[in-house]
Amino acid sequence: MGFEWGFKPSSKITQSTVSSQGTGNVMIPTAGVKQKRRYANEEQEEEELPRNKNVMKYGGVSKRRPQPGSLIRGQPLPLQRGMELMNKNQLQQLLVDLMTKHPEIQQSVHTRVIGLDFSIQKCLDMLKQKSEAVYQSIPYNRSYESNKLDDYAFVRMKPQILEFLNCLVDFILDNIPPRLENLHASLKFLDICTELVIKLPRFELASNNYYYDKCIEQLSHVWCTLIEHXARDRIILLADNSSVWKSHMTRLQVYNEHSNGLLERPLQLFKSLDMGSPSAASSSTLSLQESIIYHHDTMTANENNNNSGSAATDSPFN
């Protein structure tokens, strides 16, 4: 007979089993043992199956679900790291908002700011940026070279003009005595600032040029103040090269021509300075002092007129 699948107990096995019982030797059929082990293994696997549901099919790696307490949650940046990523405008706005909500910290912030030493070049770079913003705000349909910009251009350009003039006045006041002891540096900075204002595009209507003219008047007062400081320090006048003072006077004369005579007063003060010998310098002291006194009287009269008149509320020079 050929090979048969499965195991069927034959008569020989039964007979041998019966005969062996008499001798006391018990014989266990091999096929029956294998079946029992197979069934037992299957039952054990079925019992362990619910406990091993999380076993991965590939590689046999356990895929246990992590407990909620072991999850890594995202969190915002620390204050220092966040401020490192903020740009200049965001930092400025943050500081302004804090001072608005908490006015008590304004004095502390102001004390820290005025204690910083800002270079003149940094101030000039900022002024040039704001001056460029004025030119960029000019409408495309009009050219500023003709100095005949209309009312529409004035409305468009007014915010940038006021921002530039306010910044210019603040920087000038921070770079003259007693804030800055170097008189030559103050004069040079004032010279550049005056040039920036003179070159600004003007408007066809005279009333739209009010802010420009008011600014030039204030610059005239600053020029007179610096000339007064130079007149008091005779050592500077005698030790320095006269060409330096003549250069300032020449440039001031050009600015006066472009401003329709608004800088005439400091120009006359410059001309009253004698850069020659000590005797000549002492002879011009009286005339210079008289000019300075007249200058202060003029400033006082102008301030009284401004206080009595109705000046614009958004002007940076009132």
Swiss-Prot record:
Which residue intervals are annotated with compositional bias (Polar residues) in the record?
Answer: 11-24
Matching PANTHER family: FI02826P
Instruction: Give the record's subunit note.
Output: Binds the proteasome. Interacts with karyopherin SRP1 and Proteasome subunit RPN11.
Q: Supply the source organism for this entry.
A: Saccharomyces cerevisiae (strain Lalvin QA23)
Source species, domain of life: Eukaryota
InterPro entries for this protein: Cut8/Sts1_fam, Cut8/Sts1_sf
Compartments reported by the entry: Cytoplasm; Nucleus
Assigned keywords, A-Z: Cytoplasm, Nucleus, Protein transport, Transport
Which terms in the GO cellular component ontology are assigned? cytoplasm; nuclear membrane
State the residue spans of region: Disordered. Answer: 1-75
Record's protein name: Tethering factor for nuclear proteasome STS1
Q: Name one Pfam family in it.
A: Cut8
